[in-house]
């Protein structure tokens, strides 16, 4: 018989040593210790309130669990692989400390609903922290936007110069992305923040428990409504992994731009030395390792989403041991996202913008060609005709190695007699930027308003 196992009563042979090691999860689920103890204390108090176990036992259980919590946080608690997981390690130690009272703790619950509770508690805490990290990153973006409020840079499509924009406008684009990420995290929290404890192994419990009381003790606004779903649901974890994948995609896109902008070919920005590394052979190198690594870690998070989706895709109701594989993808993603956000927020705040280089780049590539077309439209020309006229003028400039502002008025009028001296005022970088005053545009007055809106709306 497996005498050392809390579930060993029906077994006549000990667990194979390799099986014990293969099935144990304590190496990674021990990080749930705080949530496991919080859940157990709430469960014990409910059992006492409902007169399912004596209040004297409840006090012993609570005190014992608090002592175990202190031991774990002090690093003096010895975790055992033979006890499989965090739940059994804590319960076994509790029973050893306080005797029979500790054996009453598991009344009316299963490890199935216990672990579901622990993961929800853990994720709930982490979602709040991730939202806070996102807010810090948004703060850094707003800081850069305000610091460089009137800096003009080229905007791109297909990575080709398109139209001039404000650098601040570009920073605010990422503010919008990360605000959506916060919204998704908040939505995920709504679905994670539901109490599963009380579902038992799969069918509920025969004891007169009060699930709503446990929910109140643990600050859950609601309890789950179906015991089968309660123990088999990992949608909230999958939803977080999907949200995290989108979040990391945003960081990866930003990383790619920072990597490009910091090259000697662009020279738009300079990252602080503290966020870069050198080369072991090339002494001149300053490598943007942080954005490169964040870009690389994005694939890791995508993989975690695929891993858990694959684990869950064919599981019959209710709990299956496969679901033990939910924790490592979840924990790894949480660690990756938090680390990436923290370092990104600090890196962006310390980033230096090369104002002159950005402006010089914005003045190249016929970036105000659309403004010429808009000018002709305001003079009465249909847009498609204006588009063709400007296309021909650009072709002429390429052949003559000129830019649009360098054309004489005679050259301009060779393309259209609607063009007058005021064309030159219409195609300056400032005129191009500030003409785009509609909501969402890059005009200075609009960008300033959006910065204030971003501050107030948080």
Curated annotation (Swiss-Prot):
GO terms for molecular function: argininosuccinate lyase activity. Gene3D superfamilies: Fumarase/aspartase (C-terminal domain) (1.10.40.30), Fumarase/aspartase (Central domain) (1.20.200.10), Fumarase/aspartase (N-terminal domain) (1.10.275.10). This is Argininosuccinate lyase. It holds the Pfam family Lyase_1. NCBIfam families: argH. PROSITE patterns: FUMARATE_LYASES (PS00163). Belongs to the lyase 1 family. Argininosuccinate lyase subfamily. GO terms for biological process: arginine biosynthetic process via ornithine; L-arginine biosynthetic process. PANTHER family: ARGININOSUCCINATE LYASE. Pathway: Amino-acid biosynthesis; L-arginine biosynthesis; L-arginine from L-ornithine and carbamoyl phosphate: step 3/3. It is an enzyme of class 4 (lyase). It comes from Geotalea uraniireducens (strain Rf4). The keyword Cell inner membrane does not apply. GO terms for cellular component: cytosol. Keywords: Amino-acid biosynthesis, Arginine biosynthesis, Cytoplasm, Lyase. It catalyses: 2-(N(omega)-L-arginino)succinate = fumarate + L-arginine. It is found in: Cytoplasm. Its EC number is 4.3.2.1.
